[in-house]
UniProtKB/Swiss-Prot annotation:
One of its GO terms (biological process) is translation. This is Small ribosomal subunit protein uS8. Belongs to the universal ribosomal protein uS8 family. PANTHER family: 40S RIBOSOMAL PROTEIN S15A. The keyword Transmembrane does not apply. The gene is rpsH. InterPro entries: Ribosomal_uS8 (IPR000630), Ribosomal_uS8_CS (IPR047863), Ribosomal_uS8_sf (IPR035987). Keywords: Ribonucleoprotein, Ribosomal protein, RNA-binding, rRNA-binding. Part of the 30S ribosomal subunit. Contacts proteins S5 and S12. Coiled coil: none annotated. It comes from Burkholderia lata (strain ATCC 17760 / DSM 23089 / LMG 22485 / NCIMB 9086 / R18194 / 383).
């Protein structure tokens, strides 16, 4: 059975994995998921990630990050969904928790944070909020 929203599945696996204090979570890989994982790593929300290819299928493993026994990611939520896409222009990209969190945005120049999108001067689809 095909998944209707693989990105929401990725975010849910991360959220559930941190709730039960797992060291890592794995999921089917895609270019967008790898790009989101790279942004999460660059921003310090996850320790690391790796893509393991097995023939035609590839798997994305994400090493979750904790600080003082608590998950680093307090909140991670999907914004743009298959039934309701959310696009924002370069001047309308939202801030998460007044700049303490990040919004992950898919732009014509790739997947990036809200701060980088504003600095680059591009808008795009708001994928999720992370705090």
């Amino acid at each position: 059975m095909s998944m209707s929203d693989p990105i929401a599945d990725m975010l849910t696996r991360i959220r559930n994995g941190q709730m039960v204090e797992k060291v890592s979570v794995s999921m089917p890989s895609s270019k967008v998921k790898v790009a989101i994982a790279q942004v999460l790593k660059d921003e310090g929300y996850i320790d690391d990630f790796a893509v393991k290819a097995e023939g035609a299928k590839s798997e994305l493993n994400i090493a979750l990050k904790y600080y003082a026994g608590r998950p680093v990611i307090e909140r991670i939520e999907r914004v743009s969904k298959p039934g309701l896409r959310v696009y924002r222009g370069r001047n309308d990209i939202p801030q998460v928790m007044n700049g303490l969190g990040v919004a992950i945005v898919s732009t014509p120049k790739g997947v990036m944070t809200d701060r980088k999108a504003r600095a680059t001067g591009v808008g795009g689809e708001v994928i999720c909020y992370v705090a």
